[in-house]
């Protein structure tokens, strides 16, 4: 896998060949998230948060930087604003390399994911303790792990899970990361919007 400027160009090229799908149907509350690529000792990593335990919704769950889209702002503007508010990373529109598929959650949100190149910013990251408990750095070999589908009582479809360290991460976060892996690492236009979420994420 190429690194630095070559890696950035590779990711941008893979995303330019991918046609993201926008969700249709009943209107949902809109949110935007960032799949952030940064560097740790010259190794590319993707950033994933564990949400603060004090949050009213999805406390303690794994998530990508992001949040609700405010009135008057575009999804991309919202994604970059939330990235700055949660992690202190100030990224411009030029840092956005592309988009992934919209993901409609069981909790009533329509998530619009953007892929953002952050580069050498990890030493400058400042976690917002009101929103973020822990920041995880996912290496590309870790990202390239095989997921699994697990039956859950009361659901018609198996739940999608992706392995990270000692955890199993669920959709929507796992689904978005899996699609990033498929598109960027393997050049596959794998769709993930149908991946089921566990019941605890429905609230």
Protein language model annotation of sequence segments:
Residues 127-167, 199:
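NUDIX/MutT-family hydrolases
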Residues 1-63, 67-85, 89-124, 161-203:
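N-terminal leader/linker segments that precede catalytic domains of diphosphate-processing enzymes
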């Amino acid at each position: 896998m190429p690194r630095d400027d070559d890696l950035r160009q590779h990711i941008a090229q893979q995303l330019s060949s991918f046609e993201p799908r926008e969700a249709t149907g009943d209107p949902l509350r809109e949110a935007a998230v960032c799949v952030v690529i940064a560097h740790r000792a010259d190794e590319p990593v993707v950033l994933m948060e564990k949400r603060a335990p004090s949050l009213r919704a999805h406390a303690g769950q794994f998530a990508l930087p992001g949040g609700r889209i405010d009135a008057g702002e575009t999804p991309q503007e919202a994604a970059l604003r939330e990235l700055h508010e949660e992690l202190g990373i100030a990224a411009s529109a030029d840092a956005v390399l592309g988009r992934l598929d919209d993901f409609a959650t069981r909790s009533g949100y329509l998530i619009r994911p953007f892929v953002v190149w952050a580069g050498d910013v990890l030493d400058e990251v400042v976690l917002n303790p009101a929103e973020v408990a822990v920041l995880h750095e996912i290496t590309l070999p870790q990202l390239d792990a095989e997921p699994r589908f697990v039956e859950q009582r009361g659901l018609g479809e198996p739940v999608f899970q992706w392995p990270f360290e000692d955890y199993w991460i669920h959709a929507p976060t796992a689904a978005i990361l899996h699609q990033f892996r498929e598109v960027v690492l393997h050049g596959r236009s794998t769709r993930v919007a149908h991946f089921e979420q566990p019941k605890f994420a429905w609230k």
